[in-house]
Amino acid sequence: MRVADFHFDLPESLIARHPLAERRASRLLQLDGPSGALRHGQFTDLLEQLRPGDLMVFNNTRVIPARLFGQKASGGRLEVLVERVLDQHRVLAHVRSSKSPKPGSQILIEGGGEAEMVARHDALFELRFAEPVLPLLERVGHMPLPPYIDRPDDEADRERYQTVYAEKAGAVAAPTAGLHFDDELLAAIRAKGVETAFVTLHVGAGTFQPVRVERIEDHHMHSEWLEVSQEVVDAVAACRARGGRVVAVGTTSVRSLETAAQSSELKPFSGDTDIFIYPGRPFHVVDALVTNFHLPESTLLMLVSAFAGYAETMAAYRAAVEQGYRFFSYGDAMFITRNPAARGPEV
């Protein structure tokens, strides 16, 4: 399959650069995978699509204010984007600077703080901070907005680029399908008899990296840490036993569950995943999906195409553009039921 098969034209005006006033105010495009039928509505219509006995699986990762500004001891300016917290004082990070810092060099952090460049690991730099890193980031860090939101972060992003159920710090990008849920909607979902469970996948900056090969089979995914607990495994088993559906909120929840079920049986899992889901790959756990609209030629669009079918997905995206849906992290959402006969692009 060619990466170019997953291209679509998107007007700049449809890229959402700010969140709506209310989380639940987004629109919802419903795609019935088996038939390809589309239905336009509001995000709160999701409640009508859920059934008593269903299980919704959310990603409870918490976005850290991972972007830092500072300067080298020589005075040169630089920007640090933390990719992964290794321990209380060490991180792996991307560093943007006219000249890369050398091992042993000091970095002075804007707002107060200091780090030492310890080593380079391919494109990432290992930094050691003088003080505990998570409190430092909370104090002087900036929210790591995606590159297509071309504006400085503001105070509102600290709340809105974060799900209301975020718990475990470590992501440098939000699991954006979850941004549409507020406490009231979650309560209404539970009141309907829908169960909830939480996985953790710390979303990395690699989620925004373009696919740089022509054939998608040649692409290698970035690695991210995730955890699927025994509690989640038991919740899925109970859902199956009562005839319910597993509804994943976001592609990160899909990747978590399907990683933990690569042997066809869902088992507890804790560790790194580089799972790449594209058309032709079977799904072992997820029956329905809540997801935002993704970038052209992105691995996430390929995942959705694997779930709903290539032709059905691309038709839905064309309809979304025609109807003026808002795209990407702060944009609108889709609710998709899995197409068991999903096919990739025609060769």
Curated annotation (Swiss-Prot):
Transmembrane segments: none annotated. Its EC number is 2.4.99.17. One of its GO terms (biological process) is queuosine biosynthetic process. Keywords: Cytoplasm, Queuosine biosynthesis, S-adenosyl-L-methionine, Transferase. GO terms for cellular component: cytoplasm. It catalyses: 7-aminomethyl-7-carbaguanosine(34) in tRNA + S-adenosyl-L-methionine = epoxyqueuosine(34) in tRNA + adenine + L-methionine + 2 H(+). It comes from the Bacteria. It is found in: Cytoplasm. Transfers and isomerizes the ribose moiety from AdoMet to the 7-aminomethyl group of 7-deazaguanine (preQ1-tRNA) to give epoxyqueuosine (oQ-tRNA). NCBIfam families: PRK00147.1, queA. This is S-adenosylmethionine:tRNA ribosyltransferase-isomerase. The gene is queA.
